[in-house]
Amino acid sequence: VHLTGEEKAAVTGLWSKVNVDEVGGEALGRLLVVYPWTQRFFDSFGDLSSPDAVMGNPKVKAHGKKVLNSFSEGLKNLDNLKGTFAKLSELHCDKLHVDPENFKLLGNVLVCVLAHHFGKEFTPQVQAAYQKVVAGVANALAHKYH
């Protein structure tokens, strides 16, 4: 992903304030609630029967944290997202058979959650930079599908 110096500063500046546990669980939970067909990849997570069940599910929260920790690694390697996410791309493609469109959906949900958490601080410029990043990460995760 090519970001200007200003965009990189905006992304890393905001990310340094992100509570990965909280935001990760909320982002994955919202994905599962807003796009319920994505739940089929999480059969082992137990009760996903209602929005409250999803948002309170400890396995959703734990996996959301894991997802955002990987995203954090991506932010440290913006110039090599394909390399950073190669193993995860392979896992999600070959073993889990996740629809690569879901990576885009999760990226967009993450942007919504960041906007919700940071309010006025999440300016249109910050959003534009994050949209570039989540699109780059989604492309890197979809790489093994091509």
Curated annotation (Swiss-Prot):
Residues 2-146 form the Globin domain. SUPFAM superfamilies: Globin-like (SSF46458). One of its GO terms (cellular component) is hemoglobin complex. The modification Phosphoserine is found at residue 44. The modification Phosphothreonine is found at residue 12. The modification N6-acetyllysine is found at residues 59, 82, 144. Pfam families: Globin. Heme b binds at residues 63, 92. The modification N-acetylvaline is found at residue 1. InterPro entries: Globin (IPR000971), Globin-like_sf (IPR009050), Globin/Proto (IPR012292), Hemoglobin_b (IPR002337), Hemoglobin_oxygen_transport (IPR050056). The modification S-nitrosocysteine is found at residue 93. GO terms for biological process: hydrogen peroxide catabolic process. The keyword rRNA-binding does not apply. GO terms for molecular function: haptoglobin binding; heme binding; hemoglobin alpha binding; metal ion binding; organic acid binding; oxygen binding; oxygen carrier activity; peroxidase activity. Transmembrane segments: none annotated. It comes from the Eukaryota. Red blood cells. Keywords: Acetylation, Heme, Iron, Metal-binding, Oxygen transport, Phosphoprotein, S-nitrosylation, Transport. Involved in oxygen transport from the lung to the various peripheral tissues. Heterotetramer of two alpha chains and two beta chains. Belongs to the globin family. This is Hemoglobin subunit beta. It comes from Ailurus fulgens (Himalayan red panda). The gene is HBB.
